[in-house]
Amino acid sequence: MVLPLMICYRPIGIIHSPFKEPKDVPIQASAAKDIEGTVEVFPEFSEGLKDIEEFSHIILIYHFHRAKFKGLLVEPYMHEEKHGVFATRAPARPNPIGISVVRLVERKGNILRIRDVDILDGTPLLDIKPYVPEFDVRENVRIGWLEKNVHKLEKARDDGRFFSLNFNYIFPASLLEAPERAKL
């Protein structure tokens, strides 16, 4: 099988949070307890939200629009040794896709009010899935090098190693507009 050189996704919405700069963002949702935000789903995708309010938690899949890829070996947060990027949760990746499990507080039309947000304001949303513990939780897991460091999670914040200050170069603002208005 020959894989395509590029896969192109169109955002289905935008994630809004109180975090305007990467340095303020908790590095995982479990360290962002009770932080509120909203998900604005573009109107042409709002029909896909039918019945989402029946779930207490949802999985947000998004594009790390300000991440800067530096290579396949990274020094992750909470550790001073390099690891393969695929053995980390670092945002700077060959395909900068993020996932977060958040609490769904309420839905009003195409707006979802959420809690436990660890996402930068203005982040492009690629997809939403319901969180189902029977599907998503595994028992008897090993967490590798994180075993010695996971206790640092609650206080850990971005330190600038993975994010670009000039995100317009990486992700043009026009792509954050509703797809029918985007100037592609």
From Swiss-Prot:
What are the alphabetically sorted keywords of the record? Answer: S-adenosyl-L-methionine
Which Pfam family, giving just one, matches this sequence? TrmO_N
InterPro entries, per database record = TrmO-like_N (IPR023370), UPF0066_cons_site (IPR023368), YaeB-like (IPR040372), YaeB-like_sf (IPR036413), YaeB_N_sf (IPR036414)
Q: Where is the TsaA-like domain?
A: 9-140
Q: Which SUPFAM superfamilies match?
A: YaeB-like
tRNA-binding as a keyword of this entry, yes or no, is no
Q: Which residues bind S-adenosyl-L-methionine?
A: P26, I27, Q28, H65, R66, R89, L120, D121, G122, T123
The keyword NADP is assigned to this record:
no
Q: Which residues cross the membrane?
A: none
UniProt family annotation: Belongs to the tRNA methyltransferase O family.
* The protein, known as: Probable S-adenosyl-L-methionine-binding protein PYRAB06630
